[in-house]
């Protein structure tokens, strides 16, 4: 398997396969996970399989650095839902560094800590196609690209290009979002099959959304 590294200007083949490297290969999928849903899990699992990664860490943020701050629920609920969602799924785990650090979750700060803590690990930071366009605005992006390899995931009806190095991965298109799940709940509609059943059971038990 060869992996394409795409920018608007270049198209090159990366060989050998990532999994043949001796260093540990770890993907990171960050997000608010408010709540986690099946599209999150499919993305994490497909990236892990297609790139031959050792594992993918789902990393809940404490406070997103966006200007339009998200309204979110307490982190212990989001963390518990993640634990329920990945239980028994091979190759998926949770990274809680941003919840532990608290404050605004800048990716550069987080990855600086992780790379220093785990010098034998190569990190692959997974983002949606919509976020690729915003890479030039990311905090300390030119230093961040030295710490991680970005992995772009195609999203329905969205195409992106960037001059930054991004490995593109195709996954089954599922137009599901956390806001969709919350809207369903607010309307009294059960979001069946949009998220793992244990997560839905937890939401109903705790009266979330």
Task: List each model region and its residues.
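Nucleotidyltransferase catalytic core that binds NTPs
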Residues: 1-209
């Amino acid at each position: 398997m060869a992996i394409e590294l795409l920018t608007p200007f270049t198209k090159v083949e990366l060989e050998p396969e990532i999994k043949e490297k001796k260093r540990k290969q770890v993907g990171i999928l960050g997000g608010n996970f408010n709540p986690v849903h099946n599209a999150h899990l499919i993305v994490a699992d497909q990236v892990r399989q297609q790139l031959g990664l050792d594992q993918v860490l789902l990393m809940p943020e404490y406070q997103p650095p966006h200007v339009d701050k998200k309204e979110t629920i307490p982190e212990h609920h989001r963390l518990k839902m993640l634990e329920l969602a990945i239980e028994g799924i091979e190759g998926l785990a949770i990274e809680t560094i941003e919840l532990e650090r608290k404050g605004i979750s800048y990716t550069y700060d987080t990855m600086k800590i992780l790379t220093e803590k785990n010098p034998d690990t190569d990190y692959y930071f997974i983002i949606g196609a919509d976020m690729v366009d915003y890479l030039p605005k990311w905090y300390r992006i030119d230093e961040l690209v030295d710490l991680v390899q970005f992995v772009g995931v195609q999203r329905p009806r969205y195409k992106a290009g960037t001059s930054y190095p991004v490995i593109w991965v195709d996954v089954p298109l599922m137009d599901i979002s956390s806001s969709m799940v919350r809207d369903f709940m607010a309307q009294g509609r059960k979001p069946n099959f949009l998220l793992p059943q244990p997560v839905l059971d937890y939401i109903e038990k705790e009266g979330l959304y």
